[in-house]
Amino acid sequence: MIIVTGGAGFIGSNIVKALNDKGITDILVVDNLKDGTKFVNLVDLDIADYMDKEDFLIQIMAGEEFGDVEAIFHEGACSSTTEWDGKYMMDNNYQYSKELLHYCLEREIPFLYASSAATYGGRTSDFIESREYEKPLNVYGYSKFLFDEYVRQILPEANSQIVGFRYFNVYGPREGHKGSMASVAFHLNTQLNKGESPKLFEGSENFKRDFVYVGDVADVNLWFLENGVSGIFNLGTGRAESFQAVADATLAYHKKGQIEYIPFPDKLKGRYQAFTQADLTNLRAAGYDKPFKTVAEGVMEYMAWLNRDA
């Protein structure tokens, strides 16, 4: 069995899909379906069982067994960069992750987990997986950074695989439940389909991010499980492309629309990553050599998926 925490969420459900594509269906999905809309991410996927996150954590802390577990993909976390409840964030992201990590170490179960590019904070260059480059801007980034630091202490003595992925700006299918935290491509598509003008912040040609397609993210996760490599790795494309490029690709698919530029909100000033670009040196050195989709390629594929029933 493979366990996917956050398996009804964005990246988790895409990992489930990637496993299904390889014929793997003996999957336990762990999630919190208090947000009932997330179930739609699983309706076209095949899993063996579902468990609520709280019940799962109780069983993990009690040392209960789940049968023959081949790996745990730990994607379950609070991923809102605008959540400032530090106790909630540390319980949900840091303590929960530590419990799972030790459960896996004791049983030598491969543990593959979601870190984040938010660990780098407001950098504009040198997004390198090393302590001197890490200075998170928000409590979400701090919770991810602290767990990475914890893992670094354990890695040298670990007898089983531990791998963390610093996801950059992931977009693609199955993110609709994320609301305001969904990608720009998702929001632009929604606005266009409502007959509204698609909106970007003023200066969007200067805001550049490493936008990585979720299908590529799932592929990297599965490659690492198959190859047993440990460590903490950036997971982006290695390219910085502008929000304007995302909008251009969206409009190219729809063949209509005119961008409306809106003022940059005061509440995000100083807390907003204006530039991200993954340094892929370590990922490539680990042996992962597949290409990543460009914004033009990924957004076109995503638009086709979003509008598949149109």
From Swiss-Prot:
The keyword Acetylation applies. This is ADP-L-glycero-D-manno-heptose-6-epimerase. The gene is hldD. Keywords: Acetylation, Carbohydrate metabolism, Isomerase, NADP. NADP(+) binds at residues 10-11, 31-32, 38, 53, 75-79, 92, 144, 170, 178. Belongs to the NAD(P)-dependent epimerase/dehydratase family. HldD subfamily. It comes from the Bacteria. It is an enzyme of class 5 (isomerase). The lineage of its organism: Bacteria, Pseudomonadati, Pseudomonadota, Gammaproteobacteria, Enterobacterales.
